[in-house]
Amino acid sequence: MSILPFPADAAGATHRQPNSRMCFACGLENPVGLQLSFYDDRAGSVVAETVIPAHFQGYPGRTHGGVVAAMLDEIVGRTAMTEDPNRFMVTAKLDVRYRRPIPVGEKLRLQGSLIRRKGRLAWAHAELRLADGSLGAEADATLMDIDSSVGDPAALGWRVYPDRSGEGEGG
C-alpha cells in the first residue's frame, strides 16, 4: 500500500490520531489492512489520504465497494474521538452513497465531520474525494458508545505511531 505523508492542506487538522496494531482500517501492523492514518482538528473534523492498492479492487481498476464502506465507517467513528482519543464508538447505522467508481492506485482523500452528540449517541458525515476533488462516495452514520471493556486502549495497541514521513509523532 502506498502511504502518503500528512496532507498539507488539511485546514487545521494537525493532531495525529492514535492507531491500533491490527484493525483492518487503521492497524499499522496489519499486513492485509488499509493502514490508514488520521488527523483531526480537535473540534470534530478528521482527514486521511491514501492510495488503494490493486489487491483491494472489485472490478478491474476499481476499489471494492466494501472497502470504500470500511474507510467511510472508520472516519465517521474517528470524528467522535476528536475531543477524547479514548472514546470508542461503534456504528449503529451507516448510509453509504456511491457517487462514482473509486479507482485503485490513485490518491484519495477522506474527510469526516461530527454533526452532533446526544447522550451515548453521535451523528457524523464522511466524504471520499478523488484526486481531482470530485465526490466519489459519502456516508452518514449514527454512532453509539461501547462498553469500556471492549474498547480498552491497551488491549487494542492504541497509540500514536510516528508519521511514516519520518517527521515524528505529531501533536
Go through each PLM region and give its residues.
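Non-catalytic linker/capping segments at the edges of enzyme domains
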Residues: 1-55, 156-159, 163-171
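A generic structural signal for short beta-strands and their flanking turns/coil linkers
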Residues: 19-20, 32-34, 44-46, 88-94, ...
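HotDog/MaoC-like acyl-thioester-processing domains
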Residues: 1-14, 102-104, 115-171
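Residue-level recognition of well-ordered beta-strand positions that form the cores
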Residues: 49-51, 95-97, 111-113, 127, ...
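Short beta-strand micro-motifs enriched in acidic
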Residues: 39-41, 113-117
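A conserved, well-ordered hydrophobic junction motif at loop->secondary-structure transitions
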Residues: 47-71
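Hydrophobic beta-strand-centered segment that forms part of the acyl-chain substrate-binding groove
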Residues: 75-109, 114
